[in-house]
Each structure stands twice: as C-alpha cells, then as structure tokens.
Amino acid sequence: MLSDVQIRALLACVKSPIHKMCLAIMYGCGLRISEATTLEVGAIDGANLQLRIIGKGNKQRIVPLPQPLLDDLRSLWRTHRNPRWLFPKRDGAKPVSMHVLGSTFRSAARSAGITSRVTPHVLRHSYATRLLEQGVDTRVVQILLGHANIATTAIYTHLTEPTRVSLRGILDRLMSGL
C-alpha cells in the first residue's frame, strides 16, 4: 500500500496527461488496470458523479466519481476529443495499453523514490484501504471493488498505523475507569 503523499509524488512524475489521468482514476475510483484503460466516454455519468464499470466476467458496477476527477477528465477529453476512449493511444483507434501504462507506473514510482516493488494494482489496494480506514463498511467496499466474495475484500482489512492509533484510543476510552 502507498500513502497519499507517495501517490501524489508518483502521479507528479507521470509526464503523459493521459497516463497520469488513467492512474489517478485507478486510485480515485478503485479500478483494476484493465477497467481503467478501457473506459469509454459513455461510462461517465457526470450529473450523478458516477462511473459505469465493466469488470471481471463482464459484470457491470457503478462507482462514485469524485468531482475533482470528473473535472480533470473533462479537461483531458477536450485535449483529444476521442469519441470512444477516455484514454486513447496516440492514433486514437484503441485505448492505452495496460503494458505501456504499467511501464509508466513503474518508471514514475522509481522517480518518486518509491523503493518497494509496486504494480499499478497498489492504487486499487490503497483506495480500498483508505475507505476502510475511514470507516466505510467492508460490504460497501466489496461492492465498489466488484468483488464476488467478501474474503477477497478482507485482504484489504490489514491493520494500518492510523487504524492502530484509532483502535488504541477507542480501547483506552472503553477501559478507562474500570
């Protein structure tokens, strides 16, 4: 998992606006790389701040789209105006490839000083962990991530330092005065 500071530093090292936005949406919406790279313009529901995602097994889910990401997506789209793909290759005929985006991610991670071996999937992992740290129910996170099995989501419920500190405070209050 990466901290917010590390993610911001990593994204700041991405030169291509299309690659940067694709990685940002992976983090901001908890998407798999395959879901992000193949996002179509029609997947955006700007009025309701939602994205329609076609996930594993062709299953559809709706995820919240933060307003800052929607604004950035609109600005990016105005630069290429591709009628189909949000993140097109240079020729516009196909979406950006997962392989190329993965290479961009690894290069940016190195440039940002991230020494641990990370893949783009760490953005999705970080999204899920942040939601759980903020008290979002595991079942809600399961739905947002498109996990068929709650056990898959449970992987993200490891105790992070903010969770430990919060837990210590709760337990201290519960046990005080016994």
PLM regions: where:
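Conserved catalytic core of the tyrosine transesterase superfamily
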Residues: 1-178
